[in-house]
Amino acid sequence: MLLLENKKIENNKMKKIYNNLSIENLTKTEWFNWFNEYEQQEIIKGLEKNLDVSWYAKQEYSWTQMKQLRIGLEDNLDVSFYANPELTCFQMLEIYIGLRKKLNVSIYTDPRFNSLKMKEIRMGLQKNLDVSVYAKPYFSNYEMKEIRLGLRDHLDVALYAKKDFNCLQMEQIRLGLKKNLNVLLYANPDFNPDQMKELRYGIKRGLDASIYAKKDFNCRQMEEIRLGLKNNLDVSLYANSEISWQEMREIKLKLQKESTQL
């Protein structure tokens, strides 16, 4: 509230500079010459439409920021939500879009949210999702997207909406939940996305993925064990993390050949 009050006081002071001046005379003032050509154009455009340019006729704003504020004023929006020089013009645009759609933009006006993060929060608000689950600065925009998609599909996002997971790990957990799989077997930050994928494939096929749900196996080793299980082979003969995936493949192929000869 104090910040907004200070802005109003500053705006009132600035109004005195041009309230009684024509646009032509205003352009001849020392104050006007503080701004570069592009900034001056934004001020003139605002004045020509009788806008309260005191919101943006300030040196701390670039002309692109001024433009976003001017457009907001033209649309009769409450630009106080984004009249902040700490926000980039792209962040301002996301807040502007939210205001146009009558969303509660206060949830994402924090400058710590870059424009891409703001977009994910805005998209969630547009679908009436509980964006508080992911409207947190420590999530990347990609992580926010995975949580948003999970909320959209009514999934238990609490299983992966955590700082411990990156966006690719979140994706694997989300895809498993979407297919009603028991993701608890691999919803573990110790597994990388490729390992999670192999476990998801195994669970999806109804295989005993617990046999290779060990972080010591890399994804290629997991794949060979999974393919062995798929073909009803005795994978215990090569399910050893000390055996390379190439050796595992050789053993697997040998077991497959023997099984066809029976």
Model-derived regions, located:
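General marker for long, soluble alpha-helical cores
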Residues: L2-L262
